[in-house]
């Protein structure tokens, strides 16, 4: 019998595509949740939906299987259990409802558009151009990487693709060219510093544009929901609100990191030569790169609603429509082809997992779970005797620093943000609600600085071996606090100047 059991376990380890122990933990957790008494104020179906949602989040955190598979599992269980409807037909309609959400398709199409950056080589060229102009000192290279991130951010909704797939290879090549190699114990010459710049530029720029990271449209949806659509963050409004505090963080970040993790090599005149040599090797702009530049220009003009400003509101275009226009331009010009679209796995993966999380968030709201949890949280804060200012600060800090327990920004936002926003909307006076909401919006990307597993970019950069775990966490905490202070002081004043509140 022991031999047969060992054989069965060996089969599972070799053939079954999920991690056995995390899967068992997740299953036990689901059963445990379903066996608990239904809390007062919730229906049995609503509590079952809570169990499914929390189990999905746990499965994502434990990485039982890829996030897309876990999301599809959640959709299947929601449909099978009929927790959102009285019929199977209604339940499957609910489970698939969010796949028609324009915000989700905005991210999917923008990922497809961003594929052109890598295919044409324009992303690499942009990075090398900035380094060729700013790279005479190590800090200057840091600024070059930061500006590269800023330029690419509006068009690359996968911060992982941007920071890990475009900027990080450039950073590694530069570090290697100066003899900074973790395998040789020389990572602190330059690589540690540049890796941290690579990471923190990625998180800062992720918060500056709706289309800079995948969960941002979900944040927009939550903010609109808790304000009954009175505060709807358009692409332009988001970018304008985050412009000054975001640029301030981006300008200070390379200097701060040069103090927190100083590079041993300060002057790097050869970096300019390296970048110029690579640019010469690449040659002049290709036709594909020119089309990409033109397409990005069109996207920026349309996302900024300039036609509507000039010709009137009849020319206003939804951001998702604009993204489709950009994708169509790239396809009909041959810059990318249909096979590129089909093979961009991250886009279709995002459609599934993002759709499932949005769907469950919507159903939790419809079934009264969010209102129930928000009331519990609100009552707890009120019973503590906190004023609204302290309550607002506590909500922001709890939300941001609870990210230590999450390995996915999307999972964290899906699990907690709507409830925290709802509580804030109930406690903060109406005239001060907008700055609170915008601080929560900023915190949703600032928290990505904290750990080496905080977002998809983190393990890519950390895995290169240039930064130790202790350094990563220490620098991440300090930068998180500094960025929160910048947004809380400069950001709030900037939003007041803009007339947002």
Model-identified regions with their sequence ranges:
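Hydrophobic transmembrane alpha-helices of multi-pass small-molecule transporters
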Residues: 1-106, 226, 230, 236-375, ...
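C-terminal ends of transmembrane helices
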Residues: 55-62, 116-129, 133, 332-340, ...
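Transmembrane alpha-helix interface/packing and boundary motifs in multi-pass membrane proteins
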Residues: 58-66, 148-158, 200-210, 305, ...
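Hydrophobic or amphipathic alpha-helical targeting/insertion segments
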Residues: 94-178, 193
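Alpha-helical transmembrane segments of multi-pass membrane proteins
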Residues: 107, 139-153, 179-206, 232-241, ...
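Re-entrant/interfacial helical elements at transmembrane boundaries that shape
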Residues: 160-176, 195, 208-227, 270, ...
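C-terminal transmembrane helix pair
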Residues: 177-183, 243-246, 355-360, 370, ...
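Membrane-core helix-loop-helix motifs of multi-pass transport proteins
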Residues: 178-266, 457-493, 501
